[in-house]
């Protein structure tokens, strides 16, 4: 029998007392339980998050191009950002897991944390509407938006530009290893620019590991030029 949802902790996170506990119970149930889980709410919450962030970027940065806004949105809505916010709120402590996922460390998975906060946004949207979802999103993401003084450049794009500007071959990425269970994988990716330099990094997804590897290699190359 599952433990009852901690409604007091949930209310502290979303900023209001939930009326429809069924929605929030679903938003915080992992598929490993064998019950209905958060995947559909995650799908919805991901779209709500994107809409609210895109609208806010459009309003706050009137001179920004479509490409600049896309770069900002990519960072703000990334799995890494969502996971960091979920962990700061201690949201994983409320997620229900099956025994195997729990013993595999599911509560410490960034992927699951990111999925859960999107599912929570989906539940909040269904229960209280777009304005409540917007209030929650801006309360948690607002400081990050304010902190974006310039549109961030994706490390892979920056590394590509570095190589092209110096007449080097474009970066090449390869999977070194993939470990961990399906719900909490760990990828190790290597990136190299010919025989000039190489770096490796890990991530909870192939994309995250590639990004981290590109950032590591770029930092190394730029450090050599100083």
UniProtKB/Swiss-Prot annotation:
Alphabetical keyword list: Cytoplasm, Endonuclease, Hydrolase, Magnesium, Metal-binding, mRNA processing, Nuclease, RNA-binding, rRNA processing, rRNA-binding, tRNA processing
Reactions mediated catalytically: Endonucleolytic cleavage to 5'-phosphomonoester
Taxonomic classification: Bacteria, Pseudomonadati, Pseudomonadota, Alphaproteobacteria, Sphingomonadales
PANTHER family: RIBONUCLEASE 3 (PTHR11207:SF0), RIBONUCLEASE III (PTHR11207)
Residues that, per the record, bind Mg(2+): 42, 115, 118
One GO cellular component term noted in the UniProt record for this chain: cytoplasm
Family: Belongs to the ribonuclease III family.
Cofactors demanded by this protein: Mg(2+)
The protein's Enzyme Commission number: 3.1.26.3
Gene3D superfamilies, per database record: 3.30.160.20, Ribonuclease III domain
Compartments where found: Cytoplasm
Function per UniProt: Digests double-stranded RNA. Involved in the processing of primary rRNA transcript to yield the immediate precursors to the large and small rRNAs (23S and 16S). Processes some mRNAs, and tRNAs when they are encoded in the rRNA operon. Processes pre-crRNA and tracrRNA of type II CRISPR loci if present in the organism.
Protein name according to UniProt: Ribonuclease 3
Active site as annotated: 46, 118
């Amino acid at each position: 029998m599952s433990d009852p949802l901690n409604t007091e902790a949930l209310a502290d996170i979303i900023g209001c007392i939930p009326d429809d506990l069924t929605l929030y119970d679903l938003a915080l149930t992992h598929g490993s339980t064998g019950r209905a889980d958060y995947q559909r709410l995650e799908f919805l919450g991901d779209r709500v998050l994107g809409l609210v962030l895109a609208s806010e970027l459009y309003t706050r940065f009137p001179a920004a191009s479509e490409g600049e806004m896309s770069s900002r949105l990519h960072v703000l809505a990334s799995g890494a950002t969502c996971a960091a916010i979920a962990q700061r709120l201690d949201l994983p402590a409320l997620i229900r897991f099956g025994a195997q996922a729990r013993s595999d460390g599911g509560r410490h998975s960034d992927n699951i944390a990111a999925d859960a906060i999107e599912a929570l946004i989906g539940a909040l949207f269904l229960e209280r509407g777009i304005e409540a979802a917007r209030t929650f999103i801006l309360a948690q993401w607002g400081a990050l938006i304010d902190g974006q003084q310039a549109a961030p450049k994706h490390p892979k794009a920056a590394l590509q530009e570095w190589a092209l500007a110096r007449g080097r071959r474009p970066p090449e990425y390869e999977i070194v290893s993939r470990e961990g269970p399906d719900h909490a994988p760990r990828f190790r990716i290597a990136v190299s620019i010919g025989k000039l330099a190489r770096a490796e990094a890990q991530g909870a997804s192939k994309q995250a590991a590639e990004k981290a590897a590109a950032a590591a290699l770029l930092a190394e190359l730029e450090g050599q030029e100083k």
